[in-house]
Amino acid sequence: RAGIVPDIVVLSKSIGGYGLPLALTLVNPAIDCFTPGEHNGTFRGNQLSFIAAKAGLEYMLENKVEKQVQEKAPIVKEFIEKEILPLDSRLKLRGIGLIWGIDCSEFPDKNFSDKVTRKAFDHKLIIELAGRDNSVVKLMPPLVIDKETLIEGLKALKAAFEDCLKELN
């Protein structure tokens, strides 16, 4: 998609499935100089993590999670573009799939994004901040979220932005 062809890719965290630790290093065969088992660390062979990762992959394949994400991603993008961004021209959107960020860095109040997360919590939505100076409101719902719950969360996010923008005026 971005035209990047890496020599090395490091994957970790949720790749283990069900919250168990697991990390992988993928190396382009053209530069791989290790023999199997030669490149390892002090925490190797966590069989429980391998089993959990396998179960997670099987779940994703059986439940067509990638297809679900492709169906829900436009819902999120369109909602934010049509319902949230028009609230204020200083809001900027970036993201892909079900990982989105609403950049609030153009607001003079450098705590604006933090206020949005607090208001979202009042609307029963837990969201986090990201980006430089925590100026980006991060939306990252579960990949398996149902559409009704997703839309409910998006409406809560919009309400949080509306509340914070009213307080500015």
Predicted regions and their residues:
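Conserved N-terminal phosphate-binding loop of PLP-dependent enzymes in the Aspartate aminotransferase
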Residues: 1-169
